[in-house]
């Protein structure tokens, strides 16, 4: 818990700085898209995460690897920002900074992230129904969906938006029925 608090205190100002640059350059969405890709890469490449977070590895080596990972088509603001994190010895906070950037960008654009668990993969029309329902419930302009399949739900969906959970699953209905029969 303590590490998480320290991490968020460090991440917040860096994320705000990147957001400010993205806003002033009109690249809020472009940088956000690259950050999502970067977070996905870090999630799927634990060796890369360990490499950039290792304090023993020299900054120049980290910069070289990050430049190679980002490629020549990467947004220069994001690439320069990551090099700044290396220079300031804050690169180990890259993931929390990126997460905080996305959170701040969502607030700025009145966007909500809806984490949807369903028994089977949702098709496009089902996703649109969920998006419309979340917009109605939250008043958001835009809804980002993060979907995952959870076979234990039996049927239906569970939607998590921030700290709110909307359980429209068969498993949830059975649990509520079980509680009412006690």
UniProtKB/Swiss-Prot annotation:
Molecular function terms, GO-annotated: proton-transporting ATP synthase activity, rotational mechanism
Subcellular location: Cellular thylakoid membrane
Sorted UniProt keywords: ATP synthesis, CF(1), Hydrogen ion transport, Ion transport, Membrane, Thylakoid, Transport
Keyword Transmembrane listed: no
Top-rank lineage group of the source organism: Bacteria
Membrane topology designation: Peripheral membrane protein
GO cellular component terms given for this protein: plasma membrane-derived thylakoid membrane; proton-transporting ATP synthase complex
Subcellular location, principal: membrane
Keyword presence, Protease: no
NCBIfam families associated with the record: ATP_synt_delta (TIGR01145)
Homology family: Belongs to the ATPase delta chain family.
Known partners and oligomeric status: F-type ATPases have 2 components, F(1) - the catalytic core - and F(0) - the membrane proton channel. F(1) has five subunits: alpha(3), beta(3), gamma(1), delta(1), epsilon(1). CF(0) has four main subunits: a(1), b(1), b'(1) and c(10-14). The alpha and beta chains form an alternating ring which encloses part of the gamma chain. F(1) is attached to F(0) by a central stalk formed by the gamma and epsilon chains, while a peripheral stalk is formed by the delta, b and b' chains.
PANTHER family in alphabetical order: ATP SYNTHASE DELTA CHAIN
Functional summary from the UniProt entry: F(1)F(0) ATP synthase produces ATP from ADP in the presence of a proton or sodium gradient. F-type ATPases consist of two structural domains, F(1) containing the extramembraneous catalytic core and F(0) containing the membrane proton channel, linked together by a central stalk and a peripheral stalk. During catalysis, ATP synthesis in the catalytic domain of F(1) is coupled via a rotary mechanism of the central stalk subunits to proton translocation. This protein is part of the stalk that links CF(0) to CF(1). It either transmits conformational changes from CF(0) to CF(1) or is implicated in proton conduction.
Official protein name in the record: ATP synthase subunit delta
Organism: Microcystis aeruginosa (strain NIES-843 / IAM M-2473)
């Amino acid at each position: 818990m303590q590490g998480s608090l320290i991490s968020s205190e460090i991440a917040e100002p860096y994320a705000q700085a990147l957001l400010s640059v993205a806003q002033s350059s009109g690249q809020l969405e472009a940088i956000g898209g690259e950050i999502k890709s970067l977070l996905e890469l870090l999630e799927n490449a634990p060796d890369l995460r360990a490499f950039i977070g290792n304090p023993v590895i020299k900054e120049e080596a980290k910069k070289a690897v990050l430049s190679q990972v980002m490629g020549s088509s990467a947004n220069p603001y994001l690439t320069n920002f990551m090099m700044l994190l290396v220079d300031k010895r804050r690169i180990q906070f890259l993931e929390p900074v990126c997460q905080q950037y996305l959170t701040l960008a969502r607030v700025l654009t009145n966007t909500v992230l809806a984490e949807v668990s369903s028994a089977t993969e949702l098709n496009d029309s089902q996703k649109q129904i969920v998006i419309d329902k979340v917009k109605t419930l939250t008043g958001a302009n835009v809804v980002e969906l993060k979907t995952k399949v959870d076979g234990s739900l039996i049927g239906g969906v569970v939607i998590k938006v921030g700290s709110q959970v909307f359980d429209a699953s068969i498993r949830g209905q059975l649990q509520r029925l079980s509680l009412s029969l006690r």
